Amino acid sequence: MGLTLTQKILSAKVGREVKPGELIEVDVDMVLGNDVTAPVAIKEFEKIGIDRVFDNTKIALVPDHFVPNKDIKSAEQVNIMRKFAKKHGIVNFFEVGQMGIEHALLPEKGLVLPGDVVIGADSHTCTYGALTCFSTGVGSTDMAAAMATGKAWFKVPEAIKFVLKGNLQKWVSGKDVILYIIGKIGVDGALYKSMEFTGNIKALSMDDRFTIANMAIEAGAKNGIFDFDEITEAYVKGRAKREYKVFERDVDAEYSEVYEISLDEIRPQVAFPHLPENTRNIDEVGKVKIDQVVIGSCTNGRISDMEIAYKILKGKKVHPDVRLLIFPATQEIYLECVKRGYIEEFIKAGAAVSTPTCGPCLGGHMGILAKGERALATTNRNFVGRMGHPESEVYLSSPAVAAASAIAGYIVSPEEV
């Protein structure tokens, strides 16, 4: 049998064909850490007792979870990163003012490219598979080892193929597609497998693909990965500062399962507490009142997400009982929002607009929920206590549903505002 897209990339790194279940060691093209995970990795790295990192251009340190520093502990965490970056001449350390949410920032800067093998000490490192690379999350100890050796080990995953057909309806986006898929297969439906997306992927923008790959981990996947096409090429062109290699799956590649997804049939989705698999069509949600709406995160903080929110919010007001928080994912996206007039309209509508940060997504800061409060968010997880008090609730949706709901005061379709 032939090789899947993930097998093709890993085989090229190993220098021979690899099979699912094999344990392999490969050279990595990028090692990533943030202000939660990198300080732990740095301490482990220093225990190894070597003088330098394997390559100061292939490590990215991005403080994004608790920045701008929310307290003394978070300030100390970032300072560990800052000192390490200076000591080892880490080229890709992003200080406050340059940083963004890591999984939006690295593709934007051209630091992850097609054909790469990327590891990050953050579970949503799988985002970069939208660019036809193998990327996956690891622990801080694996990050430390990779910073020292430039290598990582994996068990080669089996793969599931998702064949996309048709086109998206109005107000339906990549977020709705991935919530629909997770609702279909469950949070363990792709456990330690590669989710490979093919078919009519031209129906999806690059931002849609980032969103879908980002949430592959919410189905338990090792990685999510898209075919390379002209949309991928257009995104990478002008960003890539080094050569990259495009891989294609074999026509006779073996998959553990194959799903056909009819994009035409997908309506806006909402994931109910407390798992991303608890999805319902917007028409089946009912009148769920909300206290807070969050638009942003590594899942939905890109310029197209901001544009959708702008189109819905323009000339309208946020419901008086709702707090609307908007987080452009990077400084570049924030600046583009300013240039296009989005920020002005957000503020006129009654939203609070923040510098890039993960903020409330992980219950960090800038939008923590109190007991009994309910939020609708464009983030990727809605576990118990994820955004604050254990007795609060988080619902997940697209930016379109989130913006419309902020106006209505309850979860609603964009068609209704």
Swiss-Prot record:
Binding-site positions, [4Fe-4S] cluster: C298, C358, C361
Report which superkingdom the organism of origin falls in.
Answer: Bacteria
Q: What EC number(s) does its UniProt record assign? A: 4.2.1.33
Entries under CDD domains matching the protein: IPMI
Q: Which SUPFAM superfamilies match?
A: Aconitase iron-sulfur domain
Q: What does this protein do?
A: Catalyzes the isomerization between 2-isopropylmalate and 3-isopropylmalate, via the formation of 2-isopropylmaleate.
Q: What is this protein called?
A: 3-isopropylmalate dehydratase large subunit
| Native organism | Thermoanaerobacter pseudethanolicus (strain ATCC 33223 / 39E) (Clostridium thermohydrosulfuricum)
